[in-house]
Amino acid sequence: MTRITFPMIVLAVMITTGCTQQKAEQSQERLNLSNLDRTVAPGASFYQYATGGWQEANPIPDEYARYGSFDVLREENQVQIQSLITELGTQVNPVGSNAQKVGGLYALGMDSVKLNRDGAAPIRPQLEEIAGAKDKKDIVLLMAKVSRYASSPFFGFTVGADDKNSGMNIAHIYQSGIGMGDRDYYLLEDAHSRMLRDAYVALMETQFQHTGYTGAGAKQAAANVMKIETELARAHVTKEMRRLPELNYHKMWVSDLNAKVAPFEWALYFEAMGAADLDSLNVSQIEPVKAAVAIIRREPVAVLQDYLSWKVINSAAGYLSDDFVNANFEFYGKALSGSKELRPRWRRTIDAVNGAMGEAVGQLYVEKYFPAQAKERMLDLVDNLKTALGERISQLEWMDDETKSKAQEKLGTFIVKIGYPDKWKDYSSLEIREDSYWQNMMRASEFEYGEMIAELGKPVDKTKWYMSPQTVNAYYSPSSNEICFPAGILQPPFFYMNGDDAINYGGIGVVIGHEMTHGFD
């Protein structure tokens, strides 16, 4: 389950405890004793006692680094979505409809012949644009442009609620720009970290060569990127520090950025980001942004071009030919995550379509799979658990009356979202063309960026969802004090529409309680 903190920190905690057909649900809506290991005394190892049978019956598949009931449901959910999208392919869908766009994007992702024939051609226009940069001004403009459709270079830019005025959206810039995800992988000297660094450099060399670099050129480009990312990582704050809101809030006037952060072409950058009239923002982590600016000012244009090119190549790799995909998996799947086998193309493509057009897929999904009555059943469960939590708060001996009053107030004002949004996102301005899988993923990213930048300076939309309805997960958002349970998780083994209350409290009830307690982290 997920605690969503905006704009850029997402803390995910997935619960591994472990509706499409009533018959299937009825066969599961009771305690399955075969999941237990009754050869072990509960007092000796309750975990083994409670899950030993399930573990023995469900060995970790080669394509996973971890595996639990959550993952089983996610796989089943993907089968549902595949069935839905395959059905779209048998219909004549109006041009420009969500059904046509979803089906068209999925077809491009599944067309291995075209993907392998195209090779690196789909990213050639972006790489040529970067290669044409003549000076640092061009680099700043490209940095902004790339961040609209690829992994943020140098530092990130987003729009989200003001932590100290949660009803208003403001701009935030924050640490970003590293390809291995965590600073420790760049800095620690243990054998595993050194292995990852070597593997990451090897990945970059391979992918640069796939785009046409010579062997020597690819080696130099990879070294340039690694130098920049290591310097960025050295300035990045730790995961632990990012969890402390007071250390990640530095709101200031744009006119003060040169003095309080670093001299930079801020006006040019914000204009390129579509925020020319920006007057204030939050700099979540000052030192990493300062370090990024220092790199841009110091390094030659050619070195910065290699870095920006890598951001494009690495972001696009999963949507290109098999040589890109396989090299990407060797590092991100095997070395970094521990997976042994690449997931089937159809599963990867469904994930991509969900990411690109989440609510479009979600609208089709709930029409086919989610009964409206489930909302009412869930509301009853949530209300009962809120009451129970309120009673526990009132009985806490270690909490003073003033704090109890504040806690009860927060509990009483939880916004509860169940199943799917009341208003669906409008995808009419998003074009899905037949040119390439990657170019459509670019358009989808740029569409989402446009949706985000349109919220700048406006009140927070309390009706907005931060997960698509088909997602097998849930979240709590502190900025809006809301808990959300998408339709995707409201299926066995978490939720049974016609099941006994005891089964539902032991399944989705755990998830509800988990998200509620995030409100009191």
Predicted regions and their residues:
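Structural recognition of the beta-strand scaffold that forms the well-ordered cores
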Residues: 45-49, 170-172, 482-486, 519
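Intrinsically disordered, low-complexity linker/terminal regions across diverse proteins
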Residues: 225, 260-263, 282-286, 343-350, ...
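Hydrophobic/aromatic-rich, well-ordered segments within soluble, folded domains that form packed cores
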Residues: 35-56, 190-209
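C-terminal motif of bacterial Sec signal peptides marking the signal peptidase cleavage site
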Residues: 15-18
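Noncatalytic, helix-rich "gating/capping" subdomain that lines the substrate-entry/channel surface
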Residues: 88-379, 384
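Bacterial Sec signal peptide processing site at the extreme N-terminus
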Residues: 20-29
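Bacterial N-terminal signal peptides that target proteins for export
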Residues: 1-8
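Active-site-surrounding "flap" and adjacent substrate/cofactor-binding loops of secreted or lumenal enzymes
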Residues: 41-44, 49-114
